[in-house]
Amino acid sequence: MSSVAACRRRRDVYRLFTGRSSEYWVGRFMPNASNLDITRRMGQFKSDLMGINFVAQIAFAYGSYTQSNRLIDNATALLEDIPAEDNRYIKAWNSVDAIARNAYESQALLQLSTEYCIKGRCEECPLTALLKRHGV
């Protein structure tokens, strides 16, 4: 848990998920492998997804539970360090010039999409209220 909670940067998550496979796993899934000291690396894309959807969530939840501002700040800093996601929801926001600069912002746009846009709750959306206040 301490390794997960300590992640503040994208590279910390990448390092967390880089490790050596034990003899058991190498021998079990790679029976013809001659070198049992094989390092397995998760790619950067999957590492980023783990940072967004696992590491930051666990750190934030545990920080909230234990009232640790340090853990909450670590989770926030991590999301700010990871690039924005690139999925259909974020592409839709990009098409109207709501560009997410990092995962923190893309998660906010994703939340708006799933809670308001998809459910047809446009009039309840905080963004709609903001646009109306500014006469847009």
Give the role of each language-model region.
Residues 1-107:
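Hydrophobic, aromatic-lined core segments that form the binding pocket/scaffold
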